[in-house]
Amino acid sequence: MKYIYNFLLMIQFLTRIPVKRSLPCEKEDFRRGAAMLPLIGLIVGCIQWVVFYILSKIFPANITAIFIILVGMVLIGGLHQDGLGDIFDGFFSFKGDKEKIIEIMKDSRVGTFAVLALIFDILIKYSALSFIIENNMSYAIIITPIMSRCTLVFLFLIGKNAKKNGTGNLFIENVSVKEFIISFIFMIVPSVLLIGYKYSVIIIVVSFIITLAFLNLCNRKIGGITGDCLGANNEIVEMFTMLVFVALLYIN
C-alpha cells in the first residue's frame, strides 16, 4: 500500500493531475516514489498520445504537434521548462562563482538566455513531432517522457546536491541502485513493447550520454545539481530523444 501512496505522491508533486488526498511526505516516501517516475512519464505520454489520436483525425500534423506540446506543459505546470530557462540564464548569462550562478537561477525574472532556450525547446519539439506524426511513429510520443524521467532517477543516484536546501534535495542523493533498477524496468518494458529492442537501445544510449554530459556541465558550473538542473535535463533529453526518432525515421 505504501508504494501506491508514494506513486500518488509523485503524481501530486510533479503534475497538475488532481490527487485530493493527504499523503505522507517524508524523505523515505520521495525515495521510494522516485522509482515511479517513468510511470509518471507513461501517464503524461499516454495523455499526449490520446490528444494526438483525436486531433490527427481533424487537423494536419503541425497543428496536432502544437497541442501535444501544450498539453504536456499543462500537465506538469511548466515545471521542467522553468528549470530549463533558469539553467540557461544562470549558466550562460554570467561567468563567475557558484553562489552567483545559483542566485541568478533563483531569480524569478526571465532573462534573454532563458527565452532563447525555451524558444529552441518548443521549436525542436514542434518540428520533431510534426515529422514523427507524418511518418506514423506516434508511439514516440509515449516513449519520450518515459525515457526522460528515467534519466532523472539516474541523476538522483549519481549526482550530488549543489545547494544545502531546495526541492531537488528531496530526490538528489536520496535513491539507491534498487530504485534506479526499478525505474529502468518501468522504462525498458514499454519501450521494447512499443518501438522494439533496436530502437530502444539506441534511444537509451543517447539519452544517458546526454544526461552524463549535462551532469558534467552542472558539476563544472555549480559543483552539483539542483531541482532546476533536473527540469532542464528532462527537457534536453526529450529534445534529443525526439531528434533520434526523427533521424532513425529519416535514415530508414
Curated annotation (Swiss-Prot):
Catalytic activity: alpha-ribazole + adenosylcob(III)inamide-GDP = adenosylcob(III)alamin + GMP + H(+); alpha-ribazole 5'-phosphate + adenosylcob(III)inamide-GDP = adenosylcob(III)alamin 5'-phosphate + GMP + H(+)
Cellular localization per UniProt: Cell membrane
Reported cofactor(s): Mg(2+)
Top-level lineage group: Bacteria
GO cellular component, as recorded: plasma membrane
Primary site of residence: membrane
Positions of transmembrane segments: 35-55, 58-78, 113-133, 139-159, 170-190, 192-212, 231-251
EC number: 2.7.8.26
Keyword set includes Zinc: no
Gene Ontology biological process terms from the UniProt entry: cobalamin biosynthetic process
Keyword annotations from UniProtKB, A to Z: Cell membrane, Cobalamin biosynthesis, Magnesium, Membrane, Transferase, Transmembrane, Transmembrane helix
Pathway: Cofactor biosynthesis; adenosylcobalamin biosynthesis; adenosylcobalamin from cob(II)yrinate a,c-diamide: step 7/7
Membrane topology per record: Multi-pass membrane protein
Gene Ontology molecular function, alphabetical: adenosylcobinamide-GDP ribazoletransferase activity; cobalamin 5'-phosphate synthase activity
Family from the record: Belongs to the CobS family.
Protein role: Joins adenosylcobinamide-GDP and alpha-ribazole to generate adenosylcobalamin (Ado-cobalamin). Also synthesizes adenosylcobalamin 5'-phosphate from adenosylcobinamide-GDP and alpha-ribazole 5'-phosphate.
NCBIfam families in UniProt: cobS
Protein name: Adenosylcobinamide-GDP ribazoletransferase
Organism: Clostridium tetani (strain Massachusetts / E88)
